[in-house]
Amino acid sequence: MIRKGLLFICLLCLGGWQLTAAERIDEAKHVLVDDFETYAESIYNSIDDKDLNYKAFQTGLKGYVKLASEGKIEKNSFLTVIDMSRSANENRFFLIDLQQKKIIHKSIVAHGKNSGGEYARSFSNKIGSFKSSIGFYKTAETYKGKHGLSLRLDGLEYSNSNARQRAIVIHAADYVSQVFIKNNGRLGRSLGCPSLPAKGYEEIISKIKNGTLLFVYYPEGHYLKNSQLANHKQRTSSVQGILKETI
């Protein structure tokens, strides 16, 4: 990327007079995007887990850097990605340590019963929809409910802003298990919550509670086009700076 930057500077020196100011700004934006892509790819390649979709990770990283730099999430190294483009029978919950560049936990996770069967295909922010909601969430406080230890979530976008009012939380459920898949052909479904397997879930909640970032991904065109977090342009220096500040 150093060579790219030098090439860009040389082009401005040698032929910049041929470009308008607007064209030079646009060209600079492309360089910034390329820088971020390269940095995101380097982390992704270090993680080296084919279950993790690159686009899901890259989009989640964009939101992480923007929100952490603005002080809107805790500046620790955890980013949780739920990839709703994958089968519910496959691992699609990924707890990533960006500092160590590795996945420290992955598992199956349920989606809302009205979002689809084995695959989630429909999403909603409406109260009573019993569908999953895509987008960025900030984890909040824990409580003990009918499912045991549970973690409240606050939606940060138009696509999930009703999360708290809808009681969308992370909790464990007996229908989230390989036994259920074997007996029913697919994973069980929730009322909209990202439900986890019972084994080890309390440790996961303990790691990500109180202000870390969770991103629920699905390649839905309207969301990817209109989300301010998914479309934010990042500087490589911003990414590196935020990660250096993590615990």
Residue spans for each PLM region:
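Bacterial Sec-dependent N-terminal signal peptides
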Residues: 1-26
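Cell wall/extracellular polymer interaction/catalysis modules
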Residues: 23-191, 198-212, 221-247
